[in-house]
A protein has these predicted regions:
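S-adenosyl-L-methionine-dependent methyltransferase catalytic module, highlighting the catalytic core
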Residues: 8-30, 57, 61, 110-125, ...
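Conserved N-terminal segment of class I S-adenosyl-L-methionine
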Residues: 1-94, 98-100, 114-117, 186, ...
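Activation segment
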Residues: 78, 90-93, 108-109, 141, ...
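Short catalytic micro-motifs in class I SAM-dependent methyltransferases
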Residues: 103-107
Length: 233
């Protein structure tokens, strides 16, 4: 049986029923593609947790494929998802092989973000990895807006993303506990692609892939995706 609270009580399982006019659609699809590529190359017998997984799209998909993957979310519960705060995960030290945390940290207040990253490092095995995506407050369009209007373009409302911050600040937090092995930018917010994404998101998915491949310096992108390895003492 599923239990929903927060935005899932209000909006339903919106990641499972994607709206074609959702402006975030092209970025979401690219992010999920990268996550699936990682999981496909991961040992299914390893211990995997998707922290802040929402409806558990990846959790349910890969459990059906035989993976040892569990979700954890404050606002969702199902047979494969534990409804709890992952800051109080209850997991043993060095007990997890892979953590996914996709577009979650920005929903947390600043002090809790570093606590979350430290908790990931605590529960990961010595060879453990964390796959984390976070939006970048200092993306290209946001910088233009600040230059001309004195105002940054937030990645969502301040109520929804209280922890919105420039990507360099996230990286400083990651570097305290992890080694950044890879970093990739999605959706460089140049004027043309930004306008088209707002007007017709489902029609520019291919254009996003092209931009992401050739024209996406991470510092200018809306979303950054990181592969982190646990920093050993």
């Amino acid at each position: 049986m599923k239990k929903r609270s927060g935005e899932y009580a209000e909006r339903g399982d919106y990641h499972a029923n994607l709206r074609q006019d959702w402006p975030y659609l092209p970025v979401y699809l690219e992010k999920m593609k990268l996550a699936r590529q990682l999981l496909d190359a991961t040992d299914p017998n390893g211990v995997i947790f998707d922290m802040g997984c929402g409806e558990g799209i990846l959790v349910d998909e890969y459990r059906r494929a035989g993976y040892n993957i569990t979700g954890m979310d404050l606002n969702y519960a199902s047979p494969s998802i534990l409804q709890k705060n992952f800051l109080e995960s209850g997991l043993e030290d060095s007990s997890v092989d892979l953590i996914l945390c996709l577009d979650v940290l920005e929903h947390m207040p600043f002090p809790e973000q570093e606590l979350a990253v430290a908790e990931f490092a605590r529960v990961l095995s010595p060879q453990g990895r964390a796959f984390i995506s976070v939006p970048n407050l200092a993306h290209f369009a946001s910088r233009l807006s600040f230059f001309f209007r004195g105002e940054l373009i937030r990645t969502s409302s301040i109520e929804r993303h209280p922890g919105d911050r420039p990507i360099a600040e996230y990286m400083r937090i990651f570097n305290k506990h992890f080694i950044i092995r890879s970093r990739r930018g999605l959706f460089p917010t140049y004027p043309m692609i930004s306008l088209l994404t707002v007007l017709a998101p489902s029609s520019v998915i291919g254009l996003h892939r092209l931009y992401n491949r050739f024209l996406a310096p991470p510092n200018l992108c809306f979303l950054n995706v990181f592969m982190l390895e646990k920093r050993l003492a």
